[in-house]
Amino acid sequence: MQQLQIAHQLGLNPPRTIVTNNWQDARAFCSDIEKVCTKSLDEPNFILDGHIYPFFTRVLEKREIFENRESIERCPVLFQEYIDKMFDIRVCVIGEDIFAFEIHSQEHDLSVHDFRGVAPDFLKHTPHKLPGSVEARIRRFMQRQGLIFSAMDFVLSRKGTYHFLENNPNGQWLWLEQITGVPLSKSMLRLLFG
């Protein structure tokens, strides 16, 4: 939640978000928002009967919130405004270098809400030029967090607005180089070895 607060303060437009196990608060929050999603607070997988199952971002029907009071009150749940997007954007900050990539998640049914729903090789990835104002805010975010590397997730809404979703200070990035040919590893080597 801290990273969402910082992103909001810096004008990176994170979606409205609440983490709660209070059913009444969840209901009130979701009543005010057109489309709501939920996602894991921690590990994106869960184990049941020895099998690993992914828990990706999922859009909720409002009735699910209204009808599941007991489940919501058992443990904290993240509820977030769902942003209808043109595509996802993975931003890799490596030292002073910023790389951004469009991930065309809207082209497959299994990745519409979360690009992790489809193996990266099946999704179109293209380099993306961020506006200078967004890059400047990302640099301020990195300074505030004391980071020299990050893999950030954004979406570009259908209205043309960039929305910060999360910061992964140890996030994956090599697949982006393998798919697009953009030499991120050169920047990583410069960062590590000068």
PLM feature spans:
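Generic enzyme active-site microenvironment
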Residues: 37, 151, 164
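Short secondary-structure junctions
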Residues: 10-13, 144-149
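Phosphate-binding site of ATP-dependent enzymes
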Residues: 31-128
